[in-house]
Protein backbone atom coordinates (compact mmCIF):
# COMPACT_ATOMS: atom_id res chain seq x y z
CA UNK A 1 0.00 0.00 0.00
CA UNK A 2 1.23 3.49 -0.86
CA UNK A 3 2.37 5.53 2.12
CA UNK A 4 0.80 8.97 2.56
CA UNK A 5 2.46 12.11 3.92
CA UNK A 6 0.56 15.29 4.68
CA UNK A 7 3.11 18.09 5.00
CA UNK A 8 3.00 21.59 6.43
CA UNK A 9 0.63 20.89 9.31
CA UNK A 10 0.48 23.59 11.95
CA UNK A 11 -2.51 22.93 14.22
CA UNK A 12 -3.62 20.11 16.53
CA UNK A 13 -6.84 19.81 14.52
CA UNK A 14 -5.08 19.15 11.23
CA UNK A 15 -2.63 16.74 12.84
CA UNK A 16 -5.58 14.76 14.18
CA UNK A 17 -7.39 14.94 10.83
CA UNK A 18 -4.37 13.58 8.95
CA UNK A 19 -3.90 10.75 11.44
CA UNK A 20 -7.59 9.84 11.41
CA UNK A 21 -7.66 9.94 7.60
CA UNK A 22 -4.91 7.35 7.40
CA UNK A 23 -1.74 9.35 6.77
CA UNK A 24 1.39 7.33 7.51
CA UNK A 25 3.55 10.45 7.86
CA UNK A 26 2.85 14.02 8.97
CA UNK A 27 5.19 16.88 8.12
CA UNK A 28 6.18 19.93 10.15
CA UNK A 29 7.96 22.75 8.32
CA UNK A 30 10.64 24.79 10.08
CA UNK A 31 11.59 27.33 7.42
CA UNK A 32 10.84 30.99 8.12
CA UNK A 33 10.05 31.93 4.50
CA UNK A 34 7.31 29.30 4.22
CA UNK A 35 3.65 30.09 4.99
CA UNK A 36 3.65 26.71 6.77
CA UNK A 37 6.54 27.59 9.09
CA UNK A 38 6.30 26.60 12.74
CA UNK A 39 8.77 27.54 15.45
CA UNK A 40 10.63 24.65 17.04
CA UNK A 41 8.76 24.82 20.32
CA UNK A 42 5.40 24.66 18.55
CA UNK A 43 6.68 21.89 16.30
CA UNK A 44 7.59 19.91 19.42
CA UNK A 45 4.08 20.39 20.80
CA UNK A 46 2.53 19.21 17.54
CA UNK A 47 4.94 16.31 17.29
CA UNK A 48 3.81 15.12 20.73
CA UNK A 49 0.30 14.67 19.30
CA UNK A 50 1.47 12.19 16.67
CA UNK A 51 0.83 8.55 17.65
CA UNK A 52 3.59 5.95 17.41
CA UNK A 53 1.86 4.37 14.41
CA UNK A 54 2.49 7.53 12.36
CA UNK A 55 5.90 9.03 11.60
CA UNK A 56 6.59 12.70 12.28
CA UNK A 57 8.77 14.39 9.65
CA UNK A 58 10.62 17.65 10.31
CA UNK A 59 11.39 19.66 7.15
CA UNK A 60 14.49 21.85 7.20
CA UNK A 61 16.09 23.99 4.49
CA UNK A 62 19.83 24.71 4.36
CA UNK A 63 20.27 24.92 8.13
CA UNK A 64 23.67 25.08 9.78
CA UNK A 65 24.90 21.95 11.60
CA UNK A 66 24.28 23.38 15.05
CA UNK A 67 20.74 24.47 14.20
CA UNK A 68 19.98 21.13 12.58
CA UNK A 69 21.08 19.23 15.67
CA UNK A 70 19.16 21.64 17.90
CA UNK A 71 15.98 21.30 15.85
CA UNK A 72 16.13 17.51 15.97
CA UNK A 73 16.83 17.57 19.70
CA UNK A 74 13.86 19.85 20.43
CA UNK A 75 11.27 18.36 18.08
CA UNK A 76 12.38 14.71 18.26
CA UNK A 77 11.02 13.76 14.82
CA UNK A 78 11.14 10.25 13.40
CA UNK A 79 12.46 11.63 10.11
CA UNK A 80 14.29 14.78 9.04
CA UNK A 81 13.61 15.92 5.48
CA UNK A 82 16.08 18.26 3.81
CA UNK A 83 14.55 20.47 1.15
CA UNK A 84 17.39 22.75 0.15
CA UNK A 85 20.78 22.31 -1.52
CA UNK A 86 22.11 19.89 1.08
CA UNK A 87 24.84 17.63 -0.31
CA UNK A 88 25.09 13.84 -0.02
CA UNK A 89 28.02 14.34 2.36
CA UNK A 90 25.82 16.51 4.57
CA UNK A 91 22.83 14.18 4.61
CA UNK A 92 25.03 11.16 5.35
CA UNK A 93 26.75 12.98 8.20
CA UNK A 94 23.40 13.86 9.78
CA UNK A 95 22.13 10.31 9.40
CA UNK A 96 25.28 8.73 10.78
CA UNK A 97 26.00 11.17 13.59
CA UNK A 98 22.46 11.82 14.82
CA UNK A 99 21.07 8.36 14.13
CA UNK A 100 17.90 9.57 12.44
CA UNK A 101 16.06 8.63 9.25
CA UNK A 102 16.95 11.17 6.54
CA UNK A 103 15.03 12.14 3.40
CA UNK A 104 16.18 14.48 0.65
CA UNK A 105 13.81 16.33 -1.68
CA UNK A 106 14.99 16.91 -5.24
CA UNK A 107 13.38 19.06 -7.92
CA UNK A 108 12.87 17.07 -11.13
CA UNK A 109 13.09 18.86 -14.48
CA UNK A 110 14.09 15.98 -16.73
CA UNK A 111 15.47 12.46 -16.74
CA UNK A 112 18.99 13.82 -16.20
CA UNK A 113 17.89 15.09 -12.80
CA UNK A 114 16.99 11.57 -11.82
CA UNK A 115 20.46 10.36 -12.76
CA UNK A 116 21.95 13.04 -10.53
CA UNK A 117 19.87 11.67 -7.67
CA UNK A 118 22.13 8.63 -7.64
CA UNK A 119 24.68 10.77 -5.78
CA UNK A 120 22.51 10.30 -2.70
CA UNK A 121 22.58 6.49 -2.76
CA UNK A 122 23.79 5.36 0.65
CA UNK A 123 23.51 8.92 1.98
CA UNK A 124 19.74 9.09 2.59
CA UNK A 125 16.95 6.72 3.53
CA UNK A 126 14.49 8.14 1.01
CA UNK A 127 14.45 10.53 -1.95
CA UNK A 128 11.42 12.73 -2.52
CA UNK A 129 10.98 13.72 -6.16
CA UNK A 130 9.32 17.14 -6.29
CA UNK A 131 8.67 19.91 -8.79
CA UNK A 132 11.61 22.26 -9.44
CA UNK A 133 11.82 24.99 -6.81
CA UNK A 134 10.49 28.44 -7.66
CA UNK A 135 10.51 31.13 -4.98
CA UNK A 136 10.16 28.54 -2.25
CA UNK A 137 11.43 24.95 -2.08
CA UNK A 138 8.27 22.84 -2.03
CA UNK A 139 4.63 23.67 -1.44
CA UNK A 140 4.23 25.46 -4.78
CA UNK A 141 1.27 23.47 -6.07
CA UNK A 142 2.94 22.56 -9.37
CA UNK A 143 3.33 19.06 -10.77
CA UNK A 144 6.18 17.86 -12.97
CA UNK A 145 6.18 15.46 -15.90
CA UNK A 146 5.72 12.12 -14.16
CA UNK A 147 6.65 10.22 -17.30
CA UNK A 148 10.33 11.03 -16.68
CA UNK A 149 10.11 8.44 -13.89
CA UNK A 150 9.12 5.74 -16.37
CA UNK A 151 11.79 3.09 -16.57
CA UNK A 152 14.03 4.73 -13.97
CA UNK A 153 15.61 2.09 -11.79
CA UNK A 154 15.34 3.26 -8.19
CA UNK A 155 18.13 2.11 -5.89
CA UNK A 156 16.85 4.16 -2.95
CA UNK A 157 13.39 4.26 -1.37
CA UNK A 158 11.48 7.19 -2.85
CA UNK A 159 8.34 9.27 -2.79
CA UNK A 160 6.46 11.64 -5.09
CA UNK A 161 5.59 15.26 -4.31
CA UNK A 162 4.76 18.40 -6.25
CA UNK A 163 1.23 19.63 -6.86
CA UNK A 164 -0.51 16.47 -5.68
CA UNK A 165 -4.22 16.90 -4.93
CA UNK A 166 -7.20 14.65 -4.17
CA UNK A 167 -8.03 14.83 -7.88
CA UNK A 168 -4.68 13.75 -9.33
CA UNK A 169 -3.03 11.57 -6.68
CA UNK A 170 -4.68 8.40 -7.95
CA UNK A 171 -3.32 8.95 -11.45
CA UNK A 172 0.07 9.86 -10.01
CA UNK A 173 0.30 6.57 -8.13
CA UNK A 174 -0.88 4.52 -11.09
CA UNK A 175 1.52 6.22 -13.52
CA UNK A 176 4.63 6.22 -11.35
CA UNK A 177 4.18 3.39 -8.88
CA UNK A 178 5.16 5.80 -6.10
CA UNK A 179 5.93 4.17 -2.76
CA UNK A 180 4.90 7.35 -0.95
CA UNK A 181 2.90 10.43 -1.95
CA UNK A 182 3.31 13.80 -0.28
CA UNK A 183 0.73 16.62 -0.29
CA UNK A 184 0.97 20.14 1.05
CA UNK A 185 -0.61 22.97 -0.95
CA UNK A 186 -2.95 20.46 -2.61
CA UNK A 187 -4.82 19.99 0.66
CA UNK A 188 -5.13 23.68 1.53
CA UNK A 189 -7.85 26.31 1.22
CA UNK A 190 -5.21 29.09 1.29
CA UNK A 191 -1.40 29.12 1.59
CA UNK A 192 -0.57 27.52 4.92
CA UNK A 193 -4.22 26.83 5.80
CA UNK A 194 -4.93 23.10 5.69
CA UNK A 195 -8.43 21.97 4.68
CA UNK A 196 -9.59 18.94 6.66
CA UNK A 197 -12.02 17.82 3.96
CA UNK A 198 -9.22 17.90 1.38
CA UNK A 199 -6.90 15.95 3.68
CA UNK A 200 -9.57 13.27 4.05
CA UNK A 201 -10.24 13.20 0.30
CA UNK A 202 -6.53 12.98 -0.53
CA UNK A 203 -5.94 10.06 1.81
CA UNK A 204 -8.99 8.24 0.49
CA UNK A 205 -7.95 8.75 -3.14
CA UNK A 206 -4.41 7.55 -2.42
CA UNK A 207 -5.65 4.43 -0.63
CA UNK A 208 -8.02 3.59 -3.47
CA UNK A 209 -5.47 4.05 -6.27
UniProtKB/Swiss-Prot annotation:
Q: Specify the superkingdom.
A: Bacteria
Q: Which organism is it from?
A: Erythrobacter litoralis (strain HTCC2594)
Pathway recorded for this protein: Amino-acid biosynthesis; L-tryptophan biosynthesis; L-tryptophan from chorismate: step 3/5
NCBIfam families in the record, alphabetically? PRK01222.1-1 (NF002295)
Instruction: Provide this UniProt record's keywords sorted from A to Z.
Output: Amino-acid biosynthesis, Aromatic amino acid biosynthesis, Isomerase, Tryptophan biosynthesis
Entry-linked CDD domains: PRAI (cd00405)
The lineage, from the top, is:
Bacteria, Pseudomonadati, Pseudomonadota, Alphaproteobacteria, Sphingomonadales
Return the similarity comment: Belongs to the TrpF family.
Protein name as annotated:
N-(5'-phosphoribosyl)anthranilate isomerase
| The enzyme's E.C. designation | 5.3.1.24
GO MF entries? phosphoribosylanthranilate isomerase activity
InterPro entries associated with the record = Aldolase_TIM, PRAI_dom, RibuloseP-bd_barrel, TrpF_fam
* SUPFAM superfamilies with a match to the protein in the record: Ribulose-phoshate binding barrel
Q: Which reaction does it catalyse?
A: N-(5-phospho-beta-D-ribosyl)anthranilate = 1-(2-carboxyphenylamino)-1-deoxy-D-ribulose 5-phosphate
For this protein, the record's Pfam families field holds: PRAI
GO terms classed as biological process: L-tryptophan biosynthetic process
